């Protein structure tokens, strides 16, 4: 594997990592479905395992999106290990802030993603993701609000 191929692969995988977070936050079905191989597995410990693009959409539409009014993921500490020219293992941390539908309150979730990425016919996608939640903490009495909700404009 050339240095250039390694750098291009790393950039493509970093985009996949971000695309998953953006797709869930912005509720973008097309983006979410496009990042998984048909035989991929996405496991969220305590929830279940979902297979392929259809499984990812099932998880989003029937579990994740109904749970939140809105959410935002912050992905960090992504570390990639090249197993071969076409297979990479990754680990990264995620912090999610969101407003739950149930109880209409805010929540903080910290999780670790352990991933496997594969390149097939020149394209990188997820072949496996395992999400392990470290913290699932409702923030009692707090509801995240957009700017302008709590403060009147100057001179009002």
From Swiss-Prot:
Induction section of the entry: Constitutively expressed.
EC numbers on record: 4.5.1.-
Active-site residue list: 25, 73
Subcellular location: Periplasm
Domain of life of the native organism: Bacteria
Consequence the record notes for mutating residue 42 to L: 5% of wild-type activity
Chief location category: periplasm
UniProtKB keywords: Detoxification, Lyase, Periplasm
Effect of residue 20 to M: 69% of wild-type activity
InterPro entries tied to this protein: NTF2-like_dom_sf, SnoaL-like
GO cellular component terms listed in the entry, alphabetical order: periplasmic space
Summary of pH dependence: Optimum pH is 7.5.
Pathway(s) served: Xenobiotic degradation; gamma-hexachlorocyclohexane degradation
GO biological process, any: response to toxic substance
An example molecular function term from Gene Ontology annotations: lyase activity
The reaction(s) this protein catalyses: gamma-hexachlorocyclohexane = (3R,4S,5S,6R)-pentachlorocyclohexene + chloride + H(+); (3R,4S,5S,6R)-pentachlorocyclohexene = (3R,6R)-1,3,4,6-tetrachlorocyclohexa-1,4-diene + chloride + H(+)
Family statement: Belongs to the HCH dehydrochlorinase family.
Subunit structure: Homotrimer.
Function, in words: Catalyzes the conversion of the important environmental pollutant gamma-hexachlorocyclohexane (gamma-HCH or lindane) to 1,3,4,6-tetrachloro-1,4-cyclohexadiene (1,4-TCDN) via gamma-pentachlorocyclohexene (gamma-PCCH), proceeding by two successive 1,2-anti conformationally dependent dehydrochlorinations. Also shows activity with alpha- and delta-HCH, giving alpha- and delta-PCCH respectively, but not with the beta isomer. Is involved in the degradation pathway that allows S.japonicum UT26 to grow on gamma-HCH as the sole source of carbon and energy.
Miscellaneous remark of the record: Is not N-terminally processed during export, so it may be secreted into the periplasmic space via a hitherto unknown mechanism. Gamma-hexachlorocyclohexane (lindane) is an organochlorine insecticide which has been used worldwide since the 1940s. Because of its toxicity and long persistence in soil, most countries have prohibited the use of gamma-HCH. However, many contaminated sites still remain throughout the world.
Protein name per its UniProtKB record: Gamma-hexachlorocyclohexane dehydrochlorinase
Gene: linA
């Amino acid at each position: 594997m050339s240095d250039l191929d390694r750098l291009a692969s790393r950039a493509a995988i970093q985009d996949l990592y971000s695309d998953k977070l953006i797709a869930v936050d912005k509720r973008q079905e097309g983006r979410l479905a496009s990042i998984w191989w048909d035989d991929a597995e996405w496991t969220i410990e305590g929830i279940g395992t979902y297979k392929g693009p259809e499984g990812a959409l099932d998880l989003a539409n029937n579990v994740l999106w109904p749970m939140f009014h809105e959410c935002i993921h912050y992905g960090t500490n992504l570390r990639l290990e090249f197993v071969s020219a076409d297979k990479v293992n990754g680990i990264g941390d995620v912090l999610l802030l969101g407003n739950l539908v149930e109880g209409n309150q805010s929540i903080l979730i910290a999780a670790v993603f352990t991933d496997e990425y594969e390149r097939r016919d020149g394209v990188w996608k997820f072949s496996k993701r395992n999400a392990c939640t470290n913290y699932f903490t409702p923030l009692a009495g707090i509801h995240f609000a957009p700017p302008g909700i709590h403060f009147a404009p100057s001179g009002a």
